[in-house]
Design a protein with these regions (language model features):
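Internal alpha-helical scaffold of NAD(P)-dependent oxidoreductase catalytic cores
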Residues: 17-102
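Long, positively charged, glycine-interspersed low-complexity recognition regions
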Residues: 162-168
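Interdomain hinge/lid region at the active-site interface
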Residues: 87-157
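Short, flexible, solvent-exposed loop/turn segments with mixed acidic/basic and small polar residues
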Residues: 13-19, 112
Length: 168
């Protein structure tokens, strides 16, 4: 089992006691695990305050992590290294900073994670490349309706992730 929460900053000085609050926690049992062991994993997630505790098979876990974590880190890294315009940091807004926050990455840990899950990550990279190629084609063909449709679909999907604000 493991959390789906972290921080791009290294070191104990960057620890955060609320890092797991409203985060997701994934239990990945194998045929070697007992029901009691799985229950203990779930209880740990509850004690730490995770908002959602899910269970995935090892295969489904690897595919999901390849998509929601490793692909996103790869996209952020690629975005930061694909262009060498000078002083770009002087011209960015929140969207660029939000999208690239995770490009500040622990290369020792993440290179290992990428290679340990390379088949799933390669699969997700292929799917992403196909989708970004569709956008490129629509731009080349000035397909405004196609672009708008892609934007509508992405907006609808993104709404599924929005968490309701907790009133303080």
């Amino acid at each position: 089992a493991h959390p789906m929460a972290g921080c791009e900053k290294l070191g104990i000085q960057n620890s955060n006691e609320k890092i797991f609050y409203e985060a997701n926690y994934i239990v990945v049992p194998t045929d070697k695990n007992t029901e009691e062991g799985k229950d203990v994993c779930r209880q740990i997630g509850e004690i730490l305050g995770f908002a959602r505790i899910s269970e995935l098979s090892p295969y489904a876990h690897d595919e999901m992590i390849g998509f929601v974590s490793q692909l996103t880190h790869g996209i952020a890294m690629s975005l930061m290294t694909c262009n060498h315009m000078e002083r770009v940091e002087d011209y960015t807004g929140d969207s660029f900073r939000d999208l690239t926050r995770i490009a500040r990455i622990d290369e020792t840990l993440w290179s290992e994670l990428f290679l340990l899950n390379k088949d799933a990550l390669l699969h997700q990279l292929k799917l992403f490349t196909m989708e970004i190629s569709k956008l490129e084609r629509m731009l080349m063909e000035a397909d405004k309706e196609g672009i708008k449709d892609m934007m509508r679909r992405s907006t609808a999907r993104r709404k599924l992730f929005d968490k309701e604000k907790v009133e303080e």
